[in-house]
């Protein structure tokens, strides 16, 4: 059973999947930082210094106006649409980057497929048989 598990775990697809998940997690952290530390502050500056991460709709009377989102969540129920907006921007960026990567891979793949395949040289014995056939056909005419 241990040997069977070893074969399964070391198969190419499982290892490739593990590498993909690890790289994906690291890429997610980079995109998170890009959105939260670069894009959202720019959007906030353009819109007059708004911090979208603290935008919410209180659903409880215990939540007071002006409370930070994290504190408001502790006090009562809130709908954090600012946080949702930030995550939607994250998703859009990740989807766009993945689209560009897959598009680039498809272009490279189509270029590779478009290259003319090398024509295999006909073996000498087949070539000789073809010449004999042609000579015999010429005699009949």
Curated annotation (Swiss-Prot):
Annotated membrane-spanning segments are: 14-34, 38-58, 82-102
Q: Which Gene3D superfamilies match?
A: Large-conductance mechanosensitive channel, MscL, domain 1
Naming one, the record's GO cellular component terms include: plasma membrane
Q: Where is this protein localized, as stated in its record?
A: Cell inner membrane
Q: Which UniProt keywords apply?
A: Cell inner membrane, Cell membrane, Ion channel, Ion transport, Membrane, Transmembrane, Transmembrane helix, Transport
Extract the Pfam families matched here. Answer: MscL (PF01741)
Q: Name one GO molecular function term.
A: mechanosensitive monoatomic ion channel activity
How does it sit in the bilayer?
A: Multi-pass membrane protein
Describe the function of this protein: Channel that opens in response to stretch forces in the membrane lipid bilayer. May participate in the regulation of osmotic pressure changes within the cell.
NCBIfam families hit by this protein: mscL (TIGR00220), PRK00567.1-4 (NF001843), PRK13952.1 (NF010557)
Binding partners and assembly = Homopentamer.
Under the heading HAMAP family, the entry gives: MscL
Q: Under which name does UniProt file this protein?
A: Large-conductance mechanosensitive channel
Q: Which organism is it from?
A: Methylorubrum extorquens (strain PA1)
